[in-house]
Amino acid sequence: MHASVGPGWLRAIGCLLAAVAAYPLYPTDRLRAQQPQQSGGIETIQVRPNVWMLAGAGGNIVVHVGWMGAVLVDTGAAEMSDQVLSAIQRITDTRIRFIINTGADPEHVGGNAVLARAGRTLLRYAPNAGNFAGSDFQTNFGAAGIMAQENVLTRMSASDTYPATGWPTEAFTGARVRSLYLNGDGVQMFHQPAAHSDADTIVFFRRADVIVAGDILDLRHFPIIDLENGGTIDGEIAALNRLIDLTVPPAPLVWHEDRTLVIPGHGRIADQADVVEYRDMVTVIRDRIADMIKRGMSLEQIKRADPAKGYRRQYGPETGPWTNDMFVTAVYRSLTAKS
């Protein structure tokens, strides 16, 4: 005897087929399909209706446009500031209103001063208007405001490289999550202590569903662990886990383009699957080195044992600013510093 299919099941199957038919088998998202534009060495990629990524200025820059104006995440290297400003002006004729820095590295904060001066503050007056000097500082003397984790301000103000007009005008401390509402979008900033460095911030545009990861994520090579500035391998893995927790995959319609997009500090745009693969790679290598340390192996012995085996071709160049050897050394020193 064969079971019959009732009308309820037929309706359910019909709804499922209709839903599948509504989505093509190939990506049609006009933004992802749009060809990047390049001018003055800056590549402009539209990733959402109101979100763009600028590449080629040192680190990736994100431009979020809305009724308030343009909100930037990072500003690139100082020497590329004029080209970056021109690229932003091709995207929008609104003023730069706010800048958020993901870290303190020169390729992310170098353009702060020029781009802030090209903008205009969101605040006509500061909350503590009774204190004239404090009021001017919070409104950045009419220029766009700059927000970052306090260690970014500490680094920039301790260096002769950066003019005071490029320092963060608001540095958040204490709580690891800071929230703002900009351009009709909820913006969350998560401080990730001791990851790439001790000054890393993840920026999440909730409505746009875009995350800016800064130097926590760089799919071109193994993560850079900046030991001198508070970076650790365990903090890096914790930060990658945070990224995974914040992202949403395209399930159940896995062939469609709808998903959380993650913009790294350098290189191509990623999604949750990319971050998971990257996190797993970093974790495997960390665990291999930790096991070798427990067995009493020296750094040179660990290098000869090749703990990055299976990943070097994709992530571990032998030459350049960040190599396989440098990564293994950083992981070893990070792990042995705890003991």
Task: Identify the role of each PLM range.
Residues 34, 124, 131, 251-259, ...:
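Accessory terminal helices/loops
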Residues 44, 67-71, 78-131, 142-144:
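Active-site metal-binding motif and surrounding structural segment of the metallo-beta-lactamase
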Residues 42-90, 201-214:
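Conserved beta-strand hairpin/beta-sheet module of binuclear metal-dependent hydrolase folds
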Residues 58-61, 70, 77-80, 103-109, ...:
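Solvent-exposed loop/turn segments at secondary-structure junctions
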Residues 46, 69-70, 75-79, 131-193, 197-198, 206-207, ...:
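Metallo-beta-lactamase
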Residues 50, 64, 74, 88, ...:
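Divalent metal-coordination and catalytic microenvironments
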Residues 1-16, 25-29:
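Bacterial N-terminal signal peptides that target proteins for export
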